[in-house]
Curated annotation (Swiss-Prot):
Segments of this protein annotated with the region Disordered: 802-828
SMART domains named in the record: PlsC
InterPro entries listed in its UniProt record: GPAT/DHAPAT, GPAT/DHAPAT_C, GPAT/DHAPAT_LPLAT, GPAT_PlsB, Plipid/glycerol_acylTrfase
Coiled coil: none
Any one cellular-component term (Gene Ontology): plasma membrane
UniProt pathway annotation: Phospholipid metabolism; CDP-diacylglycerol biosynthesis; CDP-diacylglycerol from sn-glycerol 3-phosphate: step 1/3
A GO term for molecular function: glycerol-3-phosphate O-acyltransferase activity
Protein name per its UniProtKB record: Glycerol-3-phosphate acyltransferase
Residue interval(s) of motif HXXXXD motif: 304-309
Signal peptide: none
Family annotation (HAMAP family): Glyc3P_acyltrans
Source organism of this protein record: Yersinia pseudotuberculosis serotype O:3 (strain YPIII)
């Protein structure tokens, strides 16, 4: 580089240092993209901009990547280490410099032809200042590039809203070996790079925004809404104009009013807020979503719903991943001042809890959703319908998902892909309110005062987690499961073919399974799981560390799913982090520390335990069986677990099929044997008395679930003809009684939805016949197996209410072996 050019870059870099604060995507490009800084890198930028080049250089130096301003010297030939695909627009249009990218690509390919050991990494990088999509019909399109003067003002105004996006590298060695090294390949490389940057920019900025009134006019002109308006006028005996005004009022209630400036401002506020409230936001598997957006997919984000914070956190994460914040389906309860107008500008559109009896509303909403898909906006909705009060996934509500498929049946949309997302927290600000609601308190209506009270509680929130699950392409799903689905395409009438409901139900279940597959274990949910497993809710520091180590080894050596994330910290680091959250008490004595979960915190901590209960449910069940039997063959263990696995699978959205269960159990048994929690004697699995303490705590994780199943099966066995409604009601009443008598603090223990799912599963699995009567022989077999795993006191409580005298006089199961309770603080 010449001396004058060095001076020029230094002078240009002075204002850029002050004005530009760019974000890098992905956050750690070297590890996430598999870059090798020791090998030569050719940086490829979309168009000639010195501001972009120097912004890239700053990030390269920060990431320990080669300097793009230093040329590469290979075999005595010196070539630039960066290339611009286009020269870009100029202030003076008549000056069009010669394009150098094709020549440079050809030179590099030539070097590979002459040097078989050479392998240069071609690294596409885009630098963006601002991400305004612009308005339809206003000025130049948003994909335009900027000339020097425009770039100056962009840097001045948007320097702190800029990002540097690194893409996956292309091996020039592979290109040379597979496609040759002539100029045709160089031209092709430049053309493919140009398309790559264009798609990437569209994924980051999104399509132009329509004027709200223009959108309403277009919706009003649709055949479906015209018909619904005519039906409204006829059924309510009002004028056509009045019915049309009703439709416009509904559009005003529903539609978002997306504003890029509002997104920019909220990003500043949220960045400041997250940095003070959270110790970190952990994001995993975002690259798969960036790739979907770049490939032109219409993305529908379907996260689990833990907190009102979900709306803001997910939009914030997506924005920082270089993606357009989605249009979000929010409950109408959030449409209060000032939150409603703010959420609208951030992309929220509002949805009522029920559409029943209002055909005009359902038509307007469906057409609005379809229009979002047609225009190419990403959409987000919570398939659970509302926030989980227990920390578990709720049964999915399928209305909006059904409308998504109906939007495909209008024709003309891009390929729609559902992206399940697991959102996890170490502290959920509403968890105290959830506990009150589960105890019968009336849910407060959201308002400004409630919002301010919530903001007051925002402190020391620990870590947040956003894990993107395995995408589910709708077209691929329908082609596989409903090959004739295209026969139902109709651009006017909303279609409800016979296959729609079963397909939607199956899709909803797959989404929930994939959300759970992407679960995040963390310090809070692991410590809560261990302490709640102790009957005294207390463990010595050594016991707790031992139990955390047991959980971590299980999750690492026998992982639940490839998308599940496990902390890379030691048990000591996790415990210290959890103690800093001020949820637990520490009592010190001369022997050591005792970690205590206070009584008032116990119910709240079940929320965090339930976030990951599905990850440990099968190891807990194995531990429980070995604890009771002391000696059991693998075959017998598999038989017993197979009987109740369908109930666990339906309740916790587990992903293992019946065919996968034997192999899964073998893997878990091998890991428990490796940890010496059990002894594998070849023909039998045997209890290891030396490690009974961690085994007992592990077994406790399934205790309450099995008790709940035993309640329903005992009622079915005693009264085979009981109807479904009565069975669910009686089960809940008995569960509440059991929780009072035996100190069970889990709010989901008598949750209505849990018993509803259980009864439905019993019917599907053949325990209840088509006539509605229980098959007593089957229900008794499972009940006897479950009751043997419970303490005599719990069994007696259940049978004293549900089982008639002759049924209770079954041959007694072997006495439950005496096993020492882990030492800890006893209850006062």
């Amino acid at each position: 580089m010449s001396g004058w050019r060095k001076i020029y870059y230094k002078l240009l870099n002075l204002p850029l240092k002050l004005l530009v604060k760019s974000k890098v995507i992905p956050a750690d490009p070297v590890s996430e993209l598999g870059l090798d800084p020791s090998r030569p890198i050719l940086y490829v930028l979309p168009y000639n901009s010195k501001a972009d080049l120097l912004t890239l250089r700053a990030q390269c130096l920060a990431q320990d990547l080669p300097d793009p301003l230093i040329p590469l010297e290979i075999d005595g030939v010196q070539l630039p280490s960066h290339v611009f695909i286009e020269n870009g627009p100029r202030v003076f249009r008549y000056y069009v410099p010669k394009q150098e990218s094709v020549k440079l690509f050809h030179d590099y390919l030539d070097l590979h032809r002459n040097n078989p050991a050479l392998d240069i990494q071609m690294l596409p990088v885009s630098v963006m200042f601002g991400r305004s999509p612009g308005r339809e019909g206003h000025g130049t399109p948003h994909l335009r590039v900027l000339n020097g003067v425009q770039k100056f003002f962009a840097v001045l105004w948007l320097g702190r809203d800029s990002f540097v996006r690194f893409s996956t590298t292309v091996s020039l060695r592979r290109m040379a070996s597979e496609h040759g090294t002539d100029k045709t390949i160089a031209h092709k490389l430049a053309r493919v790079a140009r398309m790559h940057f264009s798609r990437q920019r569209l994924a980051a900025v999104g399509p132009s925004l329509p004027a709200r009134q223009d959108l309403f006019k277009k919706l009003l002109a649709s055949k479906a809404i015209e018909k619904a308006v005519a039906d409204e006028a006829r059924s309510k005996k009002i004028s056509h104009e009045k019915a049309q005004q009703n439709a416009i009022t509904l559009m005003e209630e529903i539609a978002a009013n997306f504003s890029y400036e509002a997104v920019r401002l909220s990003d500043r506020v949220l960045s400041w807020t997250w940095n003070r409230l959270y110790q970190g936001i952990n994001v995993h598997n975002a690259e798969r979503v960036r790739q979907l957006a770049q490939d032109g997919h219409e993305i529908v984000y379907v996260p689990c719903h833990r907190s009102h914070m979900d709306y803001l956190l997910l939009s914030y994460v997506l924005y920082h991943q270089g993606l357009v914040p989605p249009h979000i389906a929010a409950g109408i309860n959030l449409n209060f001042w000032p939150a409603g107008p703010i959420f609208r500008r951030l992309g929220a559109f509002f949805i009522r809890r029920t559409f029943k009896g209002n055909k005009l509303y359902s038509t307007v909403f469906r057409e609005y959703l379809g229009e979002l898909f047609t225009r190419g906006y990403s959409v987000e909705y919570f398939v659970e319908g509302g926030r989980s009060r227990t920390g578990r996934l709720l049964e999915p509500k399928t209305g909006t998902l059904s409308m998504t498929i109906q939007a495909m049946l209008r024709g003309g949309t891009r390929p729609i892909t559902l992206v399940p997302i697991y959102i996890g927290y170490e502290h959920v600000m509403e968890v105290g309110t959830y506990a009150k609601e589960l105890r019968g308190a009336i849910k407060e209506k959201e308002n400004l005062l409630q919002m301010l009270r919530g903001l007051r509680k925002l402190r020391n929130l620990g870590q947040g987690y956003v894990n993107f699950g395995e995408p589910l392409p709708l077209t691929t799903y329908l082609n596989t499961h409903v090959p004739q689905w295209r026969d139902a395409i109709d651009p006017i009438e909303a279609q409800r073919p016979s296959w729609l409901t079963p397909a939607v139900n199956d899709l909803a279940n797959q989404i929930m399974v994939r959300i759970n597959n992407a679960a995040a274990a963390n310090a809070m949910n692991l410590c809560s799981t261990a302490l709640l497993a102790s009957r005294q809710r207390s463990l010595t520091r050594e016991q707790l560390l031992e139990q955390l180590d047991c959980y971590l080894q299980l999750m690492r050596n026998a992982p639940y799913a490839k998308d599940t994330t496990v902390p890379d910290k030691t048990p000591e680091e996790l415990l210290n982090h959890a103690l800093n959250m001020n949820k637990f008490e520490v009592e010190k004595d001369t022997i050591g520390d005792i970690i205590i979960l206070p009584r008032e915190q116990a119910v709240l901590m079940t929320y965090y335990r339930n976030n990951i209960q599905h990850l440990l449910i099968l190891p807990s069940l194995i531990a429980s069986m070995v604890m009771y039997h002391r000696r059991i063959t693998r075959t017998e263990l598999l038989h017993k677990i197979s009987m109740i696995y369908p109930m666990l699978k339906a309740e916790l959205f587990l992903h293992y099929s019946k065919e996968q269960l034997p192999e899964t159990l073998d893997t878990l048994i091998d890991e428990l044997a490796r940890q010496q929690l059990i002894c594998d004697k070849g023909s039998e699995l045997v209890l290891n008395p030396a490690r009974i303490r961690p085994l007992q705590l592990l077994a406790a994780g399934v205790r309450e679930t099995l008790q709940r199943y035993a309640i329903t099966l005992s009622l079915l066995s005693a009264t085979p003809s009981i109807n479904r409604g009565a069975l669910e009601k009686e089960s809940r009443i008995m569960a509440q009684r059991l929780s009072v008598l035996h100190g069970i603090n889990a709010p989901e223990f008598f949750d209505k939805a849990v018993f509803s799912t259980l009864v439905a599963t019993l019917r599907e699995e053949g325990y209840i016949s088509d006539s509605g009567d229980a098959i007593q022989e089957h229900t008794l077999e499972v009940y006897n197996m479950l009751s043997a795993l419970m303490t005599p006191e719990v069994k007696l409580t259940i049978e004293s209410v549900s089982m008639p005298a002759e049924t209770s006089n079954q041959p007694e199961a072997p006495e439950t072996p005496e096993t020492p309770e882990p030492e800890g603080k006893t209850e006062s």
